[in-house]
């Protein structure tokens, strides 16, 4: 497909300096000027979609549909922040110490140079979608894509530049983990998407410099299916939730807790639907699931399946390698009889594998869903919307989806991120653009008599102090002054 050069420490330092210089001009531009470039970029990725799709598929081995999902979400992200970004960034007025004589406002200033370290599973989407709100907020962006999939990020950046962006405002540094570590030493903010182990290292390096950061890390995401739920729809939803992008999605479902009364029926439907999925690498739209990212990752996923089977797990569907299709293909797999002692029940597999667990009640389902060091996403299917919402609110995850599985990532007006070992910070919504800014509070007082502080300094005796206390008691009872 091509090749990219590996950035040295000197290269990274020099590129960040170039970005910093360009950002000084960019931050003075209007939101409208920035938005015009992002709008052209939105239109351009749709116009060049075949080239984008071909690049994504060639780097990752994913299906055409999964590649299209990357374009759809990037376009949706652009549209959302084009429509709402200026409002999120606008000056906000707040109450100050004393009405009438004091006032307060919040202004949002760009950090400067934002660094993004992005993974291989969605190389176009994650290579550019987080950069869009950062740019609209007035930052420059330097991205370090995965060494397994650098060309999708390079293409995204090239399309941004073709849309009119100063080339020094969106730069790419290629290399391994050491490249990312060096990038953190120079930027003003770092956003990382990837595994929990590496995320901890990112947090330590960023903390040493006292720069802000966000981490979207791993997940062992649960799904709850209760009696009264639409079982056929839940099984179909799980196909997407567990096997989209060959299961290589941070928010994908890996654990399913099914109420005993409907367990057998649900398991049968899921196994039948899973066995009908079409595997392959093709530009045709009828392929349901592509390959894993590499033979090494396929080896890891297959080993995890075999380890579970050797320990007593039962395969309801899939479970096999497909060397006839290529070295990186693993069938979409449904497991039962998985015990809590098996690593596959606790550790993220990041592949097309889902395990079913019977539960006696919704209380047991909630308890087992929460029995994880991760807390990224969850899915709930119940008899009524009220019941589903009550359960969703009790699951310890950054997001919970009712009657769907991956819907959170297309819901651009709400924050998306994790709790516990699944990360810190949020993308999307107001949070997704304000994280790229520093909030500055500006408070003011009338100058008469030396200002508000001087008024307090005029308290000279107990009678004056009692008068102040009495005034505070009255103040609490006046709603518009609280």
Features from the language model and the residues they span:
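Conserved C-terminal structural/oligomerization subdomain of aldehyde/semialdehyde dehydrogenase
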Residues: 1-4, 278, 322, 329-482
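Structural signal for hydrophobic packing residues in well-ordered secondary-structure cores
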Residues: 23, 27, 42-45, 49, ...
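Short, well-ordered beta-strand elements within core beta-sheets of diverse protein domains
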Residues: 2-7, 21-28, 116, 223-225, ...
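ALDH superfamily catalytic-core signature
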Residues: 189, 197-339, 402, 464-465, ...
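N-terminal Rossmann-like NAD(P)+-binding subdomain of aldehyde/semialdehyde dehydrogenases
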Residues: 1-103
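Residue-level signal for inorganic ion chemistry
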Residues: 34, 56, 78, 138, ...
């Amino acid at each position: 497909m091509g090749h990219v050069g590996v950035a040295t420490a000197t290269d990274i330092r020099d590129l960040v300096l170039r970005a910093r210089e360009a950002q000084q001009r960019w931050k003075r531009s209007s939101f409208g000027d920035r938005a015009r470039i992002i709008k052209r970029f939105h239109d351009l990725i749709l116009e060049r979609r075949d080239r984008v799709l071909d690049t994504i598929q060639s780097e990752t081995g994913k299906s055409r549909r999964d590649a299209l999902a990357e374009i759809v979400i990037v376009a949706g992200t652009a549209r959302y922040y084009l429509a709402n970004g200026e409002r999120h960034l606008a000056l906000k007025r707040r109450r100050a110490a004393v009405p009438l004589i004091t006032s307060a406002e919040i202004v949002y200033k760009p950090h400067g140079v934002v660094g993004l370290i992005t993974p291989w599973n969605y190389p176009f989407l994650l290579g550019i979608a987080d950069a869009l709100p950062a740019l609209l907020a007035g930052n420059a962006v330097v991205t370090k894509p995965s060494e397994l999939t650098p060309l999708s990020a390079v293409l995204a950046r090239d399309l941004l530049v073709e849309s009119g962006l100063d080339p020094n405002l969106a730069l790419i540094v290629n290399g391994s983990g050491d490249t990312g570590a060096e990038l953190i030493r120079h930027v003003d903010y770092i956003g990382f998407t990837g595994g929990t182990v590496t995320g901890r290292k990112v947090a330590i390096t960023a903390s040493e410099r006292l720069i802000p950061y966000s981490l979207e890390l791993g997940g062992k995401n649960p799904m709850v299916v209760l009696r009264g739920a639409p079982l056929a729809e839940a099984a179909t939803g799980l196909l997407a939730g567990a096997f989209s992008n060959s299961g290589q999605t941070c928010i994908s479902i890996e654990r399913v807790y099914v109420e005993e009364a409907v367990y057998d029926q649900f398991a049968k439907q899921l196994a039948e639907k899973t066995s009908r999925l079409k595997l392959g690498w093709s530009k045709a739209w009828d392929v349901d699931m592509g390959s894993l990212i590499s033979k090494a990752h396929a080896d890891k996923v297959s080993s995890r399946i075999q380890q579970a089977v050797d320990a007593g797990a039962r395969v309801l569907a899939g479970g096999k390698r497909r060397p006839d299709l290529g070295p990186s293909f693993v069938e979409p797999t449904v497991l039962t009889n998985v015990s809590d002692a098996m690593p596959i029940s606790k550790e993220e597999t990041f592949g097309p594998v889902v395990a079913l667990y019977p539960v006696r009640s919704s209380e047991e389902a909630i308890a087992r869903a929460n029995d994880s060091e991760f807390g990224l996403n969850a899915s709930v299917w119940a008899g009524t919307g009220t019941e589903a919402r009550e359960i969703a609110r009790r699951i310890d995850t950054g997001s919970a989806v009712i009657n769907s599985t991956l819907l959170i990532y297309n819901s651009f007006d709400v924050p998306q991120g994790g709790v516990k070992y699944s990360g810190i910070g949020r993308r999307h919504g107001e949070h997704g653009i304000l994280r790229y800014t520093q909030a500055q509070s500006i408070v003011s007082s009338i100058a008469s008599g030396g200002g508000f502080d001087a008024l307090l300094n005029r308290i000279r005796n107990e009678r004056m102090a009692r008068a102040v206390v009495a005034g505070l008691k009255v103040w609490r009872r006046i709603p518009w002054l609280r």
